[in-house]
Every structure is written in C-alpha cells, then in structure tokens.
C-alpha cells in the first residue's frame, strides 16, 4: 500500500490532495464510523492533514493536550522515518499525532513504543489543531510542523522523494464506543497501532 503526499500552496487546497480512507476495522468494534481525509505538504510549514469522520456526537471528554485522547473518539496519524540504510522495524523513529474532536492532541516521537517524548508546547501550538463538529460529522485539521520533521529525520531527502511510512487511524478505546480503524491493516492479534512494519509506504511528490 502506498500514499503520495502532494504539494499544496494553501490549506484551502487540501481536498485536491490524494484521498486516504480508514476502512479496515479490526479487533473489537461497537460501530465503524466512516472516516477519511487528505494530507498535503505546505512548503516551510510541514505536512497538513485533514480528517473527516461521519459520526454524530463523538465522545469528547478530554480537554487538555497530552490527555489520553484515545479513550475518546479520536483520529490519528503515525509517520515512521528509518535512517539511511536502516531496515524498517518497530523500533525506528516515528511520530504519533492523536486528536479528539475537541481539537486536543496527544503527540509524541521516539524510536519504538517505550520511552517516547512529548512534542514541545511550542510545536504543539505550531500544529494548530482545529476541530469542527457538525450534526452528523466532525473534522480535524492539523499540521505536523516542518521544524519537528527536520529534527527527527533527514527531511531534505524526504522532499527529494525518499520513502517513509505512514498510517492513519480511527479509534476509541472506551468500551461503550470501542472501535479500531486503520488505513493500512495491522496484522496483530490485539489492538496495537504502534507497529511501523505495517505502515503504508509514503512519499512527498517532487
């Protein structure tokens, strides 16, 4: 599976980008909300992502960044960046951005699942996560700051077409609304989104 991130000049162009659909529902699912979105590269700013979830009255109890938003109804983007010559594994550098419909983020980076680091408050502000809740759907927009990407990977190589890896998710871990949706399927017996070996190949168009 592959996903190409197109270059855009403004946030308003995001829906001209390639569509991703989160339509693989795995493990336990009380329901399966239709979720999809777009990702584009804004030069000098970062990777801009828009999610649309066709879900009314989404669970949204958490109101502060770094809260455990995965217990709410949440959309997520994970991106993995193996170093040059490094084989893709579950211990490569990757980021996870998780957002509930309050526009609250839980965002970390690091190698592997243990010992991960929260992004700084400054970068969190630059991510400019925004939510819009409608009657029968809700939307999230967020920017993965270029400053962060340059800190954790050789981003110039990425801009020149080097492959990295990504996955998009829809999740709620609370039992009354529990569900687990993926863009690229995860081959694991129990819910676990922190497995880069199952991410889709990705690139930014030159």
Regions found by a protein language model. Give the residues of each.
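Structural preference for beta-rich elements and adjacent junctions enriched in aromatics
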Residues: 1-206
